């Protein structure tokens, strides 16, 4: 009879560390095959990795993302057109309605992979030049739009004046037709005046009435001619006034806007007050509205009044020049820091205050010394006055003695 194999060991008869080898056991192994054999881990303990928090919806996916144009201009500002000036001459023609996307190039390719580091560096280095070119093109396009809008406004005003004149001429025709119904009254009046002249009750008045009527007619014709000449020239003067004054106003507005933009971005370089934050996780930007950073980088954040109204995103700067949006849950706020301008102004004010106090002290000392000198001078003056008085009294006494 063949011998039977020994029965398998009972669970309490074998003692094995969980997760140390294959086979049935109370727990699986937690070591990943991708980490390799060089990674030292304790048996039965999981490998902990720091997972970044989820990113909130990006600014382009949120409503109201048009507020981002305050710090990142684009060509989409030309897509409004001239619908407000639509008329029979211009219609709804909009030469600036194509925008940037009409060229078949989409700068915000969210569905594609993020660009390489070389592309990002090239874009960062050439962004200033392209922004300058964009501002120049923006200025020329604004002037062209201004001239187009001016022509449309002048033409519409001219058409409105013509319509008003047409209505007045029609009203005059209607009143003429109404007054022609009273021709019988004028005929009776003429016969009555003729009868008075034949009887002798009215003499020489008819000629005077004719002369007065002729003078009134000539005066009316002269006024109408002057009004017609002035009406022909006012559109030309209005057009040239707008053409000459428009570029100056645009230049003033653009210069004011550039100054405001420069002042509003001084926080990025630390000139104005700003908020300091430290990056907790790595972040890679996928659009020009965002900036990339690594864990441990120090970021300058704009103040609350200058932050765009985008939920979960903050306006920040890494290098002091380029500004962009970063996720708020990827950074840790350290606190508010005063700008260099504020520190320098406070230091200058303190120096001026100390200098003023020193000047006051010196002035008080000089005033005291001046008072002492005046008192000494007055004492000497009093003594010199007393000496002649004494001599006079002596002389008088001598005279008295002589007498």
Curated annotation (Swiss-Prot):
Keywords recorded for this protein, A-Z: Membrane, Peroxisome, Phosphoprotein, Protein transport, SH3 domain, Translocation, Transmembrane, Transmembrane helix, Transport
Listed GO MF terms: protein transmembrane transporter activity
Membrane topology according to the record: Multi-pass membrane protein
Chain spans, region Disordered: 1-69
GO biological process: protein import into peroxisome matrix, docking
SUPFAM superfamilies registered for this protein in UniProt: SH3-domain
Localisation: Peroxisome membrane
Domain SH3: 272-336
Region (Targeting to peroxisomes): 145-233
Chain spans, region Interaction with PEX19: 175-196
Pfam families: Peroxin-13_N, SH3_9
Modified residues (Phosphoserine): 354
Protein name per Swiss-Prot or TrEMBL: Peroxisomal membrane protein PEX13
High-level lineage: Eukaryota, Metazoa, Chordata, Craniata, Vertebrata
Gene that encodes it: PEX13
